[in-house]
Amino acid sequence: EHDAITTYDDPCDIIEMPEIHRGVAVAYCDSPGPFETAELTTFYAVSPTPADWDESRVASFYREYNGHMLHNLTVHEAMPGHVLQLQHDRRSPRVTKARAAFMSGVFVEGWAVYAEEFMVSRGYAPRAAADRERAALAIRLQQLKMQLRMTINAILDVRVHSRGMTEDEGMRLMQVRGHQEEGEAVGKWRRALLTSTQLSTYFVGYVGVRDLVADVRAAHPSWTDRQVHDAVLAHGSVSPRHLRTLLGL
């Protein structure tokens, strides 16, 4: 409708995150494997709050993930973020098995964060909203908060694993500087301890994809949003620095 990007009708279900996968991320996109030929469903999984949290922490979590934030989260995880990007990936030429099997997390997360920014820049708001202009501004505010969270994710990742950051320091960084609710910060601290380098992919990837898209636009000033985005997604999940070469930049 807006000539923003090519979309597909591949099946996608929103599910409650299986218990075995909980405790790291609040949501994730689980797409068919890179060599899968059957038409399987992609799952957009969302985690409920842990059963052992008290009412105060649960309320804190849902203040963080309010209705406006969920729109931004769904842009990131589903459309036109991970779900759509991985649909393009499955249709890209399988030049080598290695490229298909080993996706660049920097590109995958970078695209999803870029998708958030792109959608709010075009005034995205749910059609059912009583006041779409007000809803668009609220989602824009949440996306700016997510930009701040993305930056803090990278700082947290580095300082936890190489600078000896304590839990108190991390919680203060997230809650005071990042304006995050306690329920979000507690979960993110656990995630920082359980993973390494992944939390940095959002910031590093966003900067790489944002700059790449800007350079594609500059090289092809007559192209529509759809042409630019389809070109960026046409080679699969390649790291931004190598994608530049594939795009002739």
Predicted segments with their positions:
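Long, His/Glu/Asp-enriched segments that create or flank divalent metal/ion-associated functional microenvironments
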Residues: 1-249
